Amino acid sequence: MKPALLEVMRMNRICRMVLATCFGSFILVIFYFQSMLHPVMRRNPFGVDICCRKGSRSPLQELYNPIQLELSNTAILHQMRRDQVTDTCRANSAMSRKRRVLTPNDLKHLVVDEDHELIYCYVPKVACTNWKRLMMVLSGRGKYSDPMEIPANEAHVSANLKTLNQYSIPEINHRLKSYMKFLFVREPFERLVSAYRNKFTQKYNTSFHKRYGTKIIRRQRKNATQEALRKGDDVKFEEFVAYLIDPHTQREEPFNEHWQTVYSLCHPCHIHYDLVGKYETLEEDSNYVLQLAGVSGYLKFPTYAKSTRTTDEMTTEFFQNISAEHQTQLYEVYKLDFLMFNYSVPNYLKLD
């Protein structure tokens, strides 16, 4: 074959390769611009097609760098609440920062939602069942799209929620820095009475009666009957208070989470919470969190039954038979929660 013919054939092959490369590049460019104009859609747990969060504003950006220049009254209120926590921690540094370093085990109450970059510290007796339901739906962990379809007992199954202590130390630090962290609090003594009513006056809570009721009666009741010592199902509120202020109680083991202080459960002097919601403004504060997370268009905080809730009037009645000495000692136990979350000393207290 002549050299000239070979050269022509070689040039033809090169041209075909160049054309194929150009065509492939052209196709890739088309796909790229299509993906930019029409981002990948995913099915979210609410059954609504929404664009993936990547590239959108995070809850932290919505909170600290709002699009509107003037802060809303709600944003100002939450700034004041954050400042109150900070000021209390500084003023009571010796008491509030006894532990300088947190361990992963201290973070088991912090529930993580990766999709919306949220961390929620749950506090028992402060609407935590409904907030756990919401976190299950938000994170897509489970088969439910409606929070109120989730049975209460299922909301408390640990496998249904991912908590911060399950991550590595670098992953924990990254999420604490980058995610919006929030918690909900309640007037401390109202929360305490709510815990007592739920755990010690309901006959179905036999596990609490056995675990704590028998111990409280054994320590605090003189001449207790054998039946009371065996069942532990008739603990009086006065006995419960005496158990809480007994120094031996916390030396033996930490408080149960239902009556543990908020600062011990959520460590607000070590972890900077971006939002502090209150039980007294539960629906407004909850829906504000959902707004910042970008889901308020199709998800609202579930309404709750007010008929069974513990009120200030009920709390006042429960404290009528508590001596001034015991009231003072109990206030000291929960003092940081009162100060940190700006709750006044109750009028019914007879402090020494």
UniProtKB/Swiss-Prot annotation:
Residues with glycosylation annotation: N205, N223, N321, N342
A single GO BP: in utero embryonic development
Binding site for 3'-phosphoadenylyl sulfate: 124-130, 186-194
Residue intervals on the Lumenal side: 38-352
Primary role: Catalyzes the transfer of sulfate to position 4 of the N-acetylgalactosamine (GalNAc) residue of chondroitin. Chondroitin sulfate constitutes the predominant proteoglycan present in cartilage and is distributed on the surfaces of many cells and extracellular matrices. Can also sulfate Gal residues in desulfated dermatan sulfate. Preferentially sulfates in GlcA->GalNAc unit than in IdoA->GalNAc unit. Does not form 4, 6-di-O-sulfated GalNAc when chondroitin sulfate C is used as an acceptor.
GO molecular function: chondroitin 4-sulfotransferase activity; dermatan 4-sulfotransferase activity; N-acetylgalactosamine 4-sulfate 6-O-sulfotransferase activity; sulfotransferase activity
Inducing or repressing factors: By BMP2, suggesting it is a target of BMP signaling.
Main localization, broad class: Golgi
Protein name as it appears in the record: Carbohydrate sulfotransferase 11
Membrane topology of the entry: Single-pass type II membrane protein
InterPro entries the record matches: Carb_sulfotrans_8-10, Sulfotransferase
GO CC aspect terms: Golgi membrane
Enzymatic reactions: chondroitin beta-D-glucuronate + n 3'-phosphoadenylyl sulfate = chondroitin 4'-sulfate + n adenosine 3',5'-bisphosphate + n H(+)
PTM remark: N-glycosylated; required for activity and stability.
Family: Belongs to the sulfotransferase 2 family.
Any Pfam family: Sulfotransfer_2
Stretches assigned to the Cytoplasmic side: 1-16
